[in-house]
Amino acid sequence: MARQLRAEQTRTTIITAAADLFDRHGYESTSLSDIVAHARVTKGALYFHFAAKEDLAHAIMELQSQAARRVAGEIDDRGCASLEALIRLTFGLARLSVEGPIARAGLRLATGGVAVRPPLPHPFVELLDLISRRLGGAVKESDIHSDVDVDAVAHSLVCFVVGTRVVGRTREPAGRLPRRTAEMWQVLIRGLVPVPRRPRYMSLAARLEREIVAAV
């Protein structure tokens, strides 16, 4: 049991070190030797868990997917309105990126052309599905104008979430993501939400930003 626990801890250490390097330097610019040095483990320990760098990348994207689904599931369990669930989801994903390198590295790997192994969905496809379902629900609940093109808005929202992180990677720290997410919603709420319902969701976005900043 103790040996198994140490092995799991070593695996986690290696994944975290790899995620940090992939996030900061990219997949192609990071070698297994770099990861070994950053994780402070032996090459034998690394190869015990991962036969190749691609296996590490896949493990990171798998963890990112699990975290995103967990955040979405926890929000769904609250039973809140669809638009509130969508806003909370985007801030939840921003928080994952602020708190650790796994989410940030997973995104960089996806935008860097690293292959996603089935049955794991591509991160952008998964995000599009999470967003589309909640947008559709918000239209039915009259929190979003009925004539909105849900597919177009969902695609634009995915591009915003991904693009903000890609651009911000070289321009500002990950801690800026909650602010950028709040700015996104200030624009979207004005364009999508009927006037009487806007104050509620503007207030929600501002509150979620404050909560993340206070927590980290």
Language-model segments: what does each one mean?
Residues G92-A94, S146-V167, R176-G191, A206-R210:
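Hydrophobic alpha-helical segments that form the core
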Residues M1-H25, S29-V41, E54-H58, A67:
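Basic, helix-initiating cap at the start of DNA-binding domains
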Residues A59, Q66, R70-E99, A103, ...:
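Hydrophobic alpha-helical connector segments
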Residues F91-I144:
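Short secondary-structure transition hinges
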Residues V125-D129, R133-E141, R171-V216:
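C-terminal peripheral helix-coil segments that are non-catalytic and often amphipathic
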Residues D23, Y47-A51, L63:
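Base-recognition residues in the alpha-helical recognition helix of bacterial helix-turn-helix
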Residues G44:
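Key DNA-contact positions within bacterial/archaeal DNA-binding proteins
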Residues E28, I144-H145:
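Conserved hydrophobic residue
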